[in-house]
Design a protein with these regions (language model features):
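Sec-dependent signal peptide hydrophobic core
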Residues: 18-26
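Short glycine- and hydrophobic/aromatic-rich loop-to-beta-strand nucleating segment
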Residues: 141-142, 258-261, 265-266
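Conserved C-terminal helix/tail region of periplasmic/extracytoplasmic solute-binding proteins
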Residues: 352-429
Length: 429
């Protein structure tokens, strides 16, 4: 056990460390380096960002608590907890000028759903930019304890039979996700459909905010849910259910959350946006280092953020997974990554997959101009510019990661999304 753990991972200890970092960050911001060395600095030092209590929000929280925002001149960045993804959307629509937020830790498909007006009030488009990916991997599909012992993993054959039996007996079978068309919804739908379970006909897909998943499973509200950490680990620790699989087992190193902002804010404050992007990139590098995991978990687990025991976050953040059904691993290859292997780079080819799946399930129209839509929302060019200014030399060679392979053998070729869509047996009518 490390000395950090033996002394107690307390919010007070972490705040002392963070306060020191913030102090040095503030000093550094008085003499900003790199991009701001010969300029007047960011147009504004202020921005308001939102986050949901999920481990993959860590880069935004750490950027604030460890002084990375301040280091690049963004000395007044608020990182505010949102009650749900719906609340995140509502506050992005408002913008900080209207009492909302300028940007957020967000499910990657949401900036597209918001920019196209599919989920906004009156279907009015609110243009957004994806500035960075926040992580790959790290989500799970967990199942109620009643189904333990059936061998449910990515293979859900037994679950298909159990669900069919329950439905025949008049029971409503519910699977919970966090936002329609979001990543958790798409992982759940992909898994069910790959196992012959139609998510639109054979089960009821319900929306539950991430922090409420465990409480709802406890009172038998649903059979399964898809969400990020720490809620799957908490479910297992409380003995309420088990993790069927981590989403990296569904698609290795899959893209997950994004750091996105209102386009009008970025357009009005390009230097401030770059400063924040650099801070988030530096925070992602910090979060990815194993020696920082304990402090990272202590920071995000504190009462200003998640309000959960560090133990609910730490294990899986280090690749230690107790699935809750007898399986366990201590060095999972599907650990959440924030920076390694270009995890932070927002590959447009990945956004193309999300849009294709949103078309599959009816969240986006079949005639959507995919190339034009991605060009408007995905600002990988800004990511590259910020990374180069930071001195990053290992940049992605292109804007596509190439052909992606899923657990069921299906492949997605970004050069031919129509062929992928045609290969899928179950989809919205």
């Amino acid at each position: 056990m490390s000395s950090f753990v033996s002394k107690g991972i307390t919010r007070r200890n972490v705040l002392k460390t963070s306060a020191t970092a913030a102090l040095f960050g503030a000093v550094n911001s008085a003499f900003p380096a790199g991009v701001f060395a010969e300029t007047s600095g960011p147009e504004t030092p202020k921005a308001t960002l939102g986050f949901i209590a999920l481990t993959d929000s860590a880069p935004l929280i750490v950027a604030r608590e460890k002084g990375f925002f301040a280091k690049y001149g963004m000395t007044d960045v608020a990182v505010q907890k949102q009650a749900s993804w719906g609340a995140t959307r509502d506050n992005i629509e408002l913008g900080s000028a209207g009492g909302g937020i300028d940007g957020a830790h967000i499910l990657t498909p949401m900036p597209y759903l918001i920019s196209t007006g599919k989920v906004t009030k009156g279907n009015v488009p609110v243009p957004m930019y994806i500035l960075s990916r926040l992580n790959v991997n790290g989500q799970c599909i967990s199942v109620a304890a009643a189904y333990k012992g059936m061998g449910v993993t990515t293979n859900a054959t037994a679950l298909k039979d159990a669900f069919a039996k329950a439905k025949a007996e008049g029971k409503e079978v519910k699977c919970a996700v966090t936002f329609p068309g979001g990543t958790h919804d798409l992982w759940m739908r992909y898994w069910l459909a790959a196992n012959g379970i139609d998510p639109n006909k054979d089960v009821s897909t319900i929306v539950v905010p991430p922090p409420q998943m465990v409480a709802n499973m406890k009172v038998n509200t649903m059979e399964a849910f898809c969400v990020g950490e720490p809620w799957n680990a908490q479910l297992v620790r409380q003995g309420i259910g088990f993790t069927a699989f981590t989403t990296g087992e569904l698609w290795a190193d899959h893209p997950e959350k994004a750091f996105a902002m209102r386009a009008d804010w970025v357009d009005a404050n390009p230097k401030a946006a770059k400063a924040m992007l650099m801070a988030v990139q530096e925070a992602a590098q910090w979060c990815d280092k194993m020696e920082n995991k304990e402090e990272m978990c202590a920071i995000i687990g504190g009462r200003d953020y998640f309000k959960v025991p560090v133990e609910d976050i730490l294990g899986r953040s280090k690749g230690e997974i107790d699935y809750g059904d007898g399986r366990s691993v201590t060095d999972s290859p599907f650990i959440m990554k924030y920076w390694a292997n270009h995890a932070s780079y927002p590959y447009p080819s990945h956004d193309l997959w999300f849009l294709t799946e949103n078309i599959r399930w009816g969240y986006q129209p079949a005639d959507l101009d995919l190339k034009a839509t991605i060009a408007k929302v995905n600002r990988e060019d800004l990511w590259r510019d910020a990374a180069k200014t930071l001195g990053v030399t290992d940049l992605p060679a292109g804007t596509s990661r190439g052909v992606e392979t899923f657990f069921d053998g299906k492949t997605f070729d970004p050069e031919n999304p129509a062929a992928y869509l045609a290969s899928l047996a179950i989809k919205a009518a």
